[in-house]
Amino acid sequence: MDQKRLTHLRQLEAESIHIIREVAAEFSNPVMMYSIGKDSSVMLHLARKAFYPGTLPFPLLHVDTGWKFREMYEFRDRTAKAYGCELLVHKNPEGVAMGINPFVHGSGKHTDIMKTEGLKQALNKYGFDAAFGGARRDEEKSRAKERIYSFRDRFHRWDPKNQRPELWHNYNGQINKGESIRVFPLSNWTELDIWQYIYLENIDIVPLYLAAERPVLERDGMLMMIDDDRIDLQPGEEIKNQMVRFRTLGCWPLTGAVESNAQTLPEIIEEMLVSTTSERQGRVIDRDQAGSMELKKRQGYF
């Protein structure tokens, strides 16, 4: 294929499909992480293209914290059914028994137990040797220096000082028993690329990405959308209906909305063209401490 004759989106598409096929051919038990967000939707679309007209040769895995938006759960189940995907859902049973709650225990402990430990449990349970993730290098500085094939030791830990060279699109997937590789096919995409590709390919997304009038309250400098009744209002707090949308999706108490009137994909793309902030500014878990994402990845987080 002559890369010079492709548009930049088609070049990114071709690179991602190549990576996905490489992993399917090289590893014995791969899995695709499915977090239900826009990046997961693009990655799933690319995987379906990679093996069309066949079915995916690996399952989808959702590590459930119990605190995702209701619209996300509905979208997850509807998508898996529509595409005939095998969907594995894992929730940390110890965390459930402990009643881990982001309001009570804080974002750090909630993320560590329900996400990081939950993910490691699922990978160990099913014996996956490679796991696709939708992370991109433009999102956050620790992700910017991570390889497409990200080596993890038998404890699922990432060592940024022990990364493998990736020259001329050659990826080293050699691992010993118990070790694994996290694979990021969207590493070279930007947030704008993602939205332009979603528009180009007419990819279905969670409606929360589009602006609508939603019940929110302001807490700690973040617009929190109230998705159910598991919240205690603090003195002086008031729930108001505002036109908001989400640039990134996660657990609803830990994911901030942004004021917006962008109700269509072209309007979102217009916003992205003038945006000067990262989409992850709305993630509470990224504010825990300096270098918090790198620390989480060292501990086994995606």
UniProtKB/Swiss-Prot annotation:
Pfam families, A to Z: PAPS_reduct
Record flagged with keyword Nucleotidyltransferase: yes
CDD domains: Sulfate_adenylyltransferase_2 (cd23946)
Catalytic activity, as annotated: sulfate + ATP + H(+) = adenosine 5'-phosphosulfate + diphosphate
Protein keywords: ATP-binding, Nucleotide-binding, Nucleotidyltransferase, Transferase
Annotated EC: 2.7.7.4
Lineage top rank: taxon: Bacteria
One GO BP annotation of this record: sulfate assimilation
InterPro entries, alphabetized: PAPS_reduct_dom, Rossmann-like_a/b/a_fold, SO4_adenylTrfase_ssu, Sulfate_adenylyltrnsfr_sub2
Keyword Iron-sulfur assigned: no
Pathways per UniProt: Sulfur metabolism; hydrogen sulfide biosynthesis; sulfite from sulfate: step 1/3
PANTHER family the record matches: SULFATE ADENYLYLTRANSFERASE SUBUNIT 2 (PTHR43196:SF1)
Family (UniProt): Belongs to the PAPS reductase family. CysD subfamily.
HAMAP family: Sulf_adenylyltr_sub2 (MF_00064)
Biological role stated in the UniProt entry: With CysN forms the ATP sulfurylase (ATPS) that catalyzes the adenylation of sulfate producing adenosine 5'-phosphosulfate (APS) and diphosphate, the first enzymatic step in sulfur assimilation pathway. APS synthesis involves the formation of a high-energy phosphoric-sulfuric acid anhydride bond driven by GTP hydrolysis by CysN coupled to ATP hydrolysis by CysD.
The protein's assembly and partners: Heterodimer composed of CysD, the smaller subunit, and CysN.
NCBIfam families registered for this protein in UniProt: CysD, PRK05253.1, PRK12563.1
Name of the featured protein: Sulfate adenylyltransferase subunit 2
UniProt organism field: Enterobacter sp. (strain 638)
